[in-house]
Amino acid sequence: MTIPSPSLTALDPVEPFDPIVARLTRLHPKVIDLTLERLQRLLARLDHPEQHLPPVIHVAGTNGKGSTVAFLRAMLEAGGNRVHVLTSPHLISFTERIRLAGRLIEEPYLVQLLEECEAANGEAPITFFEMAMAAATLAFARVPADYLLLEVGLGGRYDATNIIPRTAVSVITPIGIDHKEFLGDTLAQIAGEKAGIIKP
């Protein structure tokens, strides 16, 4: 299912002056296309950084994902753990989405990672969020940490964050009716999509 977003604010509010967002939007038009194939191809070209991540806590749901990630991060860091985090959307700067061992990713490093991903991807089609996830995955694989907290962007089963091969914990927050055009018309269908992050 491929649906062009009518505007950058449709599902993922961003600030138009953010240079990272401008770069991603210019090179990779923002399209919602729920599949993992493009990202799998790109990560293979990058030598599979998703295979070298710290233990992952993956959070899906309709309500409370961001709060749950924030609570988990606070608890883990209070216990002395180094924690990577991926959340969305951001408020002011795209760098707010990625924390490396407790600190926001620095813009020059993120640009470097995006350039590496763009070079590996070439002219192949890819979405805004998939390219961002590829860059974040490189960072998470290269910077040591004890845990990685991933917040699902949309749904779960075909969300770009579900590229990870395994999780330490999968968390489902309260589920409601949302994004029916992508996830289904019933609560059961939507729950099934979000439960797609659960792995053996």
What are these model-derived regions, one by one?
Residues P174-F182:
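Conserved Switch II/interswitch segment of TRAFAC-class P-loop GTPases
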Residues I57-V59:
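Hydrophobic anchor at the beta1->P-loop junction of P-loop NTPases
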Residues S67-F71:
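Hydrophobic positions on the alpha1 helix immediately C-terminal to the Walker A/P-loop
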Residues N162-P174:
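Inter-motif core of Ras-like GTPase G domains
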Residues M1-I32:
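Charged, amphipathic alpha-helical linker segments immediately N-terminal to NTP-binding catalytic cores
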Residues L11-D12, K30-I32, L36-R45, P49-P54, ...:
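ATP-dependent carboxylate-amine ligase catalytic core
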Residues A191-K199:
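Membrane-proximal helix-turn-helix segments that form the acceptor-binding/catalytic region
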